[in-house]
Amino acid sequence: MFDCEPVSLLITIPGQVPEPIAADFPWLSLSILFPIAGSLLVPFIPDEGEGKQVRWYALFIALTTFLITVGAYLKGFEPAEEGLQLSERVPWLPDLGLTWAVGADGLSMPLILLTSFITALAVLAAWPVSFKPKLFFFLILAMDGGQIAVFAVQDMLLFFLAWELELLPVYLLLAIWGGKKRQYAATKFIIYTAGSSLFILLAGLAMGFFGGGAPNFEFTHLANQQFGTGFQLLCYGGLLIAFGVKLPIVPLHTWLPDAHGEATAPVHMLLAGILLKMGGYALLRFNAQLLPAAHAQFAPLLIVLGVVNIIYAALTSFAQRNLKRKIAYSSISHMGFVLIGIGSFSTLGTSGAMLQMISHGLIGASLFFLVGATYDRTHTLQLNEMGGVGQKMRIMFALWTVCSLASLALPGMSGFVSELMVFAGLVTDEVYTLPFRIVIAGLAAIGVILTPIYLLSMLREIFFGQENVDLLAKRELVDAEPREIYIIGSLLVPIIGIGLYPRIMTETYTASIDGLVARDKLSIERVINTSSSEFSNQNISISNGQAPNLNIYSSSK
């Protein structure tokens, strides 16, 4: 069915991934299993009807999980190492080739820390939840372990299981605690995400059984396989669909505005802060690292899709009158920079994509938390019904302003650094021809210009628009409380810290990004050299395992 032999256009190269460094202590297994085990004990927590005990218990579990991940980083992770660290490998079902294999490198460690950090704050954001609190916090904690597993596991089948594990909690959190259209939003979410994840299973099985013999699904094994180019292209296309739904990539994005439109504040934080990053991480881990030959062909498409994300979502956000949907489309727009960075074949651009995921995780979580806090007071999401609330909520206005400035990439904040790195990486690296780079940079800049327009106009409408007399008369229209200030403050510390001193984060993953881009550039050089010398006047069929001639690549590379 697949071409399993290297073809004449051989751009399939061994991954040359360094050998994993074994863990002295099972940090990552503990960070995965501890919140899952903690969630299983939630039903046994004494409950007086208001869920006070279970709230404190969930916060304890989430904070402890965060401390475990911090311990893993401080005690067992060396940023200067390119390869896998904190590696644990235990045979699970050897006859099926399934191994409990976990580890972390520069691609995964920052996202593991982000996951545990955002989840702890989401538990604090869920403090007012009074409807079925035990079930709510059970799902939050189970989701915590599942999402950490997505970034930590190093086995394709384990990755698929972890990917599926976090779907059910999100579905239930939407379907039970969502808004009026919660059933529709939850069903749409599960259809999109569960349906597309079938491609992960198919690609994983195909790669694990490649070449005959005993199946092996571990990433280190797959990275050193010489997959045929046609095989890589088929796997890459399927995985791009699966991960494109999560990122999300336009036009696979329509589930996200509906999900955000019905979710509660803590679920917003998990969706924007963590869930979308799973798609970007998986594109780097699988598409770019395990399938370099196909990545050389698909990278220009990723860049074009990134530009479409940026412009389309920014324009759509500008037209939205619903506050949640406006911020949801803003998230889609910002994730377009991740696609451009991944497709740039530039160390600086790819590093910018990684930083953009971290930055957006923090900024997106802060904005959506503020959306939830504002809705709790106004009981409306329509911008034309919120006018003048700045008179009674001055601290809330200040928090909104700072977080919005972070989202529009104000210098001194993390979003500015990440977007600047993506632009600089694309423009300065000569992998692509100069006209292509200029056109892409110019189009992406349109989105950068639109962002402050729709965000600042949003602030004006909420806080200084035409006064809604009935709304202003409500006594529950109170200013930000200490818990809310603490949550936003906790998110702003890394946002501003990274913006002022980016190396505190970029040094965590620079070595891994350098190795990844070096292997991908070797692949693209073979595309350029071979296509220019042998295939410049031919139409090459992908079905024959050969790559098409792409004249957007610079011949100097």
From Swiss-Prot:
Reactions the enzyme catalyzes: a plastoquinone + NADH + (n+1) H(+)(in) = a plastoquinol + NAD(+) + n H(+)(out); a plastoquinone + NADPH + (n+1) H(+)(in) = a plastoquinol + NADP(+) + n H(+)(out)
Keyword Translocase: yes
Biological process per Gene Ontology, one example term: ATP synthesis coupled electron transport
Family membership: Belongs to the complex I subunit 4 family.
Descriptive protein name: NAD(P)H-quinone oxidoreductase chain 4
Membrane topology value: Multi-pass membrane protein
Gene (UniProt): ndhD
UniProt xrefs under NCBIfam families: NDH_I_M, PRK02546.1, PRK12561.1
Organism: Prochlorococcus marinus (strain SARG / CCMP1375 / SS120)
EC number assigned by the record: 7.1.1.-
Main localization, broad class: membrane
